[in-house]
Every structure is written in C-alpha cells, then in structure tokens.
Amino acid sequence: MSISLKKGQKVSLTKESAGLSNVLVGLGWDAVESKKGFLASLFGTQAADIDCDATAILLKDGKFCDKNDVVYFGNLEHKSGTVRHMGDNLTGDGEGDDEQILIDLSKVPAEYDRIVIVVNIYDCIKRKQEFGMIKNAFIRIVDGKTNREMCKYDLSDRKSTRLNSSHVRTSRMPSSA
C-alpha cells in the first residue's frame, strides 16, 4: 500500500521495502484550465502552458559539491550512470507520470549520502506561474523491481499556492534534518 505523504513527513523506504535497490521517481501534473477574455468565452477554456521539471541532486556529506551531480532535462544522466532522467515533458499532457527519474541505489557511489529530488516550474518568475495554477500534481517513488508505488506526495495540496518549487530527500542513513 502506498503512503500518502504530507508536507514535512518522513518515511523509511528501506523499512517499506527490504532490499530496495532501484527506484523510479515519477512526476505528474495537469495545467488548470482558465478562461481569459472575450475570445475564451466564445471558444471555451484553454490550459496554460506550464512546464514542471524533476531534478535529482546528489549530495556529499549533505552538501552540493559539483554541477555534474545535478540530473535534469539538461543533463540526463549522472556521470556514475546510477541516476537517469528519462526526458523533459513540457506540458504535462497525458495520464500518469509526465517525467521520470530512475535511480539504481545499489550502485550510487559511496561518497554520496543523499539524493534530493526537486520539482520546479520552468521559468516560473517570467511566466508568473506557481503550483496553484496546476492540478493533479504529484511526485511518487516506485520500487523498480516490483513496480509497487511506495509513497506519493500531492503537490497540488498546498496551503499556499504561491510556491513554485518543492523537494523530496532520500538519505542513506537516518538524518535529524
């Protein structure tokens, strides 16, 4: 059974799935349809072009050290080959995951103690976009061996719609932060 995460909540993935070695991080979203002006009233609603992006950042001793440790639409694979971004979806069209990151936990070099997954809206300031303008937004973690969804975080369930980024962190060992 998948755990539905709330802001600030922690979950032990190894406790949920012993021997976890491969995970899929999935990001999905749909633009909220909006009506603007006279023409929109004639032709119906139109979804805003909102581009959410998933990024994985590998940390050493909890710190960011090198730009090559960032895996995203502009750098699809980590130099170790253990973290791969499967491509950029610019619109959120379609069902299910719109972007995916695959992580082979068993082969991540020992010097990395954490992987932070960041979700942001591309060019959000220029486009004046925020999470309140999207619906059905989620990030989820799936056991790569069993395809079982382990946990899911609803990005649309926000107290504040003024946010344009969010993150999930995974650690090799328990952390107090």
Protein language model features and the residues they cover:
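Intrinsic-disorder/low-complexity signal
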Residues: 1-162, 166-172, 177
